[in-house]
Regions:
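Two-component/phosphorelay signaling modules centered on CheY-like receiver
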Residues: 22-41
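Active-site residues of response regulator receiver
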Residues: 64, 96
Length: 163
């Protein structure tokens, strides 16, 4: 996809970046701005994130896993609770410092649309944003949470993942 086309797609998005580390928020903001993002909001903890969602109505949220007050998983569970929170279908990219399989699985079960390792590359960030905002998977109810429909894997890939 051409850079101008990507810029045009991203410039209309209202993006919320939630991370307790000011440097990571600034780095992510810079990447988003360089990709064409024009409206980037920031929150430094989970409570501030919930308030920003209520007041600013972002199109997508980049959410850190490990934060004080409310961590990323707690925020995600609140956001994905239909009837409890006003935006259960908000696209969420979970940001993680370590790619532990248990954390990735927990994030996806709690309703993360995608995940990225920190620090991430502009290309990976752009690819995830395009994936969840412009090619979203349908949302489904899983227990008490509202989550993206699981991806369908081919039989050979599924067998590899089970091993």
């Amino acid at each position: 996809m051409a850079n101008k086309q990507i810029e045009k797609m991203l410039q209309g998005l209202n993006i919320l970046v939630v991370d307790d580390n000011a440097y990571m928020r600034r780095l992510t903001r810079t990447m988003l701005t360089n990709l064409g993002g024009r409206s980037v909001l920031e929150a430094s903890d989970g409570l501030a994130a919930l308030e920003s969602i209520r007041t600013a109505d972002p199109d997508v949220m980049l959410l850190d896993w490990d934060m004080p007050v409310l961590n990323g998983i707690e925020v995600l569970r609140i956001v994905r609770s239909p009837g409890v929170f006003p935006r259960p279908n908000l696209p969420v990219i979970m940001l993680m410092a370590r790619a532990q399989r248990a954390h990735v699985n927990e994030a996806l079960r709690a309703g993360a649309n995608e995940f990225l390792l920190k620090p991430t590359s502009p290309k990976a960030l752009c690819d995830r944003l395009i994936s969840i905002v412009f090619k979203p998977r349908p949302m489904v109810t899983l227990g008490t949470y509202y989550v993206p429909q699981p991806r369908r894997l081919s039989a050979p890939r599924e067998a590899v993942l089970r091993e």
